[in-house]
Amino acid sequence: MKKFIQDFKAFALKGNVVDMAVGVIIGGAFGKIVTSLVNDIMMPPISLLTGGVNFTDLKLVLSKAVVEGGEVVKPEVSWNYGNFIQTTVDFLILAFVIFLMIKAIMAAKRKEEEAPAAPAPTPPEIELLTEIRDLLKKQ
């Protein structure tokens, strides 16, 4: 049991696992931001352009609800394709933003790799020896 706990600790504290956990947490929060962007910022103008259609309300009713005495006896059965449209827009925006972020990271890495390393400064001893050599050549 002790070995199992040690193995788990080694696994859980590896850099990649911790990085992945942080990524999942940030990704979840970022997903909420994108959902809000789509629902609250992008879809209202689209709804305005389409004559006030709210995409989340779009559905195809397969069987209507049965109401008797003000009480629903049989609930409505519907195919809610509007939610699918909304979720697809969310996904496309999220995928596009992640694509842009990865492109930016890759470009920064490429730039870092392409930048030549500055030459190391010549030690003073070498400079002195070079000067002595040059003076001896002149004589």
Swiss-Prot record:
Write down the superkingdom of origin: Bacteria
The portions of this protein that span the membrane are 17-37, 88-108
Cell inner membrane among keywords: yes
Gene3D superfamilies found in the cross-reference section: Large-conductance mechanosensitive channel, MscL, domain 1
- Molecular function, one GO term: mechanosensitive monoatomic ion channel activity
List the keywords (alphabetical).
Cell inner membrane, Cell membrane, Ion channel, Ion transport, Membrane, Transmembrane, Transmembrane helix, Transport
Which Pfam families does the record associate with it?
Answer: MscL (PF01741)
Q: Does the keyword Transmembrane helix apply?
A: yes
InterPro entries documented for this protein: Mechanosensitive_channel_CS (IPR019823), MS_channel (IPR001185), MSC/AndL (IPR037673), MscL_channel (IPR036019)
PROSITE patterns per the UniProt record, alphabetical: MSCL
List the membrane topology term(s). Answer: Multi-pass membrane protein
- CC annotations in GO: plasma membrane
List localization entries: Cell inner membrane
Task: Write out the function statement from the record.
Answer: Channel that opens in response to stretch forces in the membrane lipid bilayer. May participate in the regulation of osmotic pressure changes within the cell.
Subunit structure, per the record? Homopentamer.
Family statement: Belongs to the MscL family.
UniProt protein name: Large-conductance mechanosensitive channel
Primary gene name: mscL
